[in-house]
Swiss-Prot record:
It is found in: Cytoplasm. GO terms for biological process: protein folding; protein-containing complex assembly; urea metabolic process. The keyword Chaperone applies. The gene is ureE. GO terms for molecular function: nickel cation binding; unfolded protein binding. SUPFAM superfamilies: Urease metallochaperone UreE, C-terminal domain (SSF69737), Urease metallochaperone UreE, N-terminal domain (SSF69287). This is Urease accessory protein UreE. Keywords: Chaperone, Cytoplasm, Nickel.
Length: 150
């Protein structure tokens, strides 16, 4: 089976639709940005992904769906630093430092998420900014954004 488009996301399904048999494809965060890849489901079925559009995969994306079954993307958990600045100044300080390092960062309502890096952990300690180190699933890929200093 070759998957060429994302059908939808389980977050947008009705409760009735969520009752279908779910087969999962477990991906590493770095695989979420790959448009072309061969994967194996948790049922041992091999499928090819060749997305027509340049979009990143996300947690819960439906790759295939029929009346009774669906194949859904799940994301393996990874080592994450969960940064919880207490003030706007702390947020600005750490955001500036992470930006200077060109580190991909994700944001929630109250947290900044980065992949674990001992240098960032040392920086957070030295700045006194609260953080935790967690094994956590993230919904989207940590993506590097290209830039230049022209």
């Amino acid at each position: 089976m070759i998957i060429e488009e994302i059908v939808g996301n389980v977050a947008n399904l009705s409760e009735e639709e969520k009752q279908k048999h779910i087969e999962k494809v477990y991906l590493e965060n770095s695989d979420l940005v790959k448009r072309i890849q061969r994967v194996t489901t948790d049922h041992g079925n091999e499928i090819g992904i060749r997305l027509k559009n340049p979009v990143d995969l996300e947690y819960g994306d439906i790759l295939y769906q029929d009346d009774h079954n669906m194949i859904v993307v799940d994301v393996n958990s990874e080592d994450i630093l969960v940064i919880q600045p207490r003030t706007l100044k702390e947020m600005g300080d750490i955001a500036h430092q992470l930006g200077n390092r060109h580190l991909p960062t994700q944001f929630t309502e109250n947290e900044m998420l980065v992949q674990y890096d001992y240098l960032v952990e040392d920086l957070l300690k030295s700045l006194g900014i609260p953080y935790t180190r967690e094994d956590r699933k993230v919904n989207k890929a940590f993506r590097h954004i290209g830039h230049s200093h022209d």
